[in-house]
A protein has these predicted regions:
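Beta-propeller blade signature
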Residues: 58-69, 115-130, 173-186, 191-199, ...
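Surface-exposed loop and turn segments in beta-propeller and other repeat-based domains
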Residues: 7-28, 70-84, 128-148, 189-242
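Short coil/turn segments that connect the beta-strands within blades of beta-propeller domains
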Residues: 43-44, 98-100, 157-159, 253-256
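Blade-loop segments of beta-propeller domains
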Residues: 62-109
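Repeated scaffold domains used in trafficking and secretory/extracellular systems
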Residues: 31-39, 83-93, 140-156, 241-248
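Beta-strand-rich domains and repeat architectures in extracellular enzymes and scaffolds
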Residues: 23-57
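Short glycine/acidic-enriched loop and turn motifs that connect beta-strands
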Residues: 52-56, 107-113, 167-172, 263-268
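Loop/turn-rich, solvent-exposed surfaces of beta-rich toroidal or solenoidal domains
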Residues: 229-281
């Protein structure tokens, strides 16, 4: 349905960025593929996630220093590999003293194109430079119920863990559940049986063979969420309105920031065809 209260939307465009706006650019990543997302560290570094261009089952988690110059940053070898997790569309960085942890959707399902989607759990992985971690080797797992396509976000300052998920019974909605981060990390443990594909067991990244596995998880269904917002993916605008692909989200205090934008849909030349559109709600 329509949101309650006055319409506070804006169609005001943002002016073209110039050099003074740039925090970092021309950063060398391990693979020649699009970035899936990034997180900023309090020490000033930037953490990037990207899919490998040679193995769609692999996510690269990369640490880099900001680069404000027009020169391409030299080859970056400060990264680790996460395999058989999922698409990595939205991930979260947790700082714990000198340690860093990535929260990401885990136990994804390989489709006929070799792509990994439909993540069943959220995994928490400690950063170890040069390491390769499979989806069944996380430090911790978090279960929110029988949902798929899990994508986390963390607002540590305000003790919030948000998880975006797909609900097969409400597929027209983009769904979120928000917990106290401190409560989630202490939630009771349970054994959960999930169905995924067996690539992580057989080392065959393109395998679509289903397998059931039992995973020891923090059971977030035992907690009372801070909030459980949802909104329609499409159909809420005027007749003939255009809707764009989801590109990511973040949460800070009592606000959820949701990004949509155009894709080039892998069509030759379309990326260079002129202006494109992106919206933050």
């Amino acid at each position: 349905g329509k949101p309650e209260g006055p319409d506070k939307s804006s169609t005001t465009g943002i002016d073209r960025f110039d050099a003074s706006n740039i925090f970092s650019r021309n950063t060398y990543l391990p693979d020649n593929t699009a970035m899936q997302g990034f997180n900023l560290d309090s020490d000033g570094s930037v953490w990037y996630t990207q899919l490998s261009n040679t193995n769609q089952a692999q996510l690269n988690w990369v640490r880099a220093q900001p680069n404000k110059t027009p020169d391409v940053q030299t080859e970056n070898k400060d990264y680790m590999k996460l395999t058989y997790f999922g698409h990595g569309t939205n991930t979260a960085l947790e700082e714990d003293g000198a340690d860093r942890y990535l929260w990401a959707g885990a136990y994804g399902v390989c489709n006929a194109k070799g792509q990994y989607w439909n993540e069943k759990l959220v995994g928490r992985v400690k950063y170890v430079k040069g390491a390769t971690v499979k989806t069944n080797e996380c430090n911790d797992y978090y279960y929110i119920g029988d949902y798929t396509d899990l994508h986390p976000s963390i607002d540590a300052e305000n003790d919030l863990l948000t998880i975006n998920y797909g609900d097969s019974k409400n597929s027209s909605y983009r769904c979120f559940v928000i917990y106290k981060l401190s409560e989630a990390k202490k939630a009771p443990m349970t054994n959960v049986t999930i169905t995924c594909t067996d690539g992580f067991q057989t080392d065959r990244p393109a395998s679509t063979n289903p397998v059931s596995v039992v995973v020891r998880c923090h059971d977030l269904t035992t907690l009372t969420p801070v909030a459980r917002p949802r909104f329609l993916k499409t159909g809420y605008g005027a007749s003939g309105a255009t809707y764009y692909d989801w590109q990511g989200y973040d949460v800070h205090k009592n606000r959820l920031y949701y990004t949509e934008g155009q894709s080039n849909y892998n069509l030759f030349g379309s990326f260079y065809s002129g202006s494109s559109f992106a919206y933050v709600t």
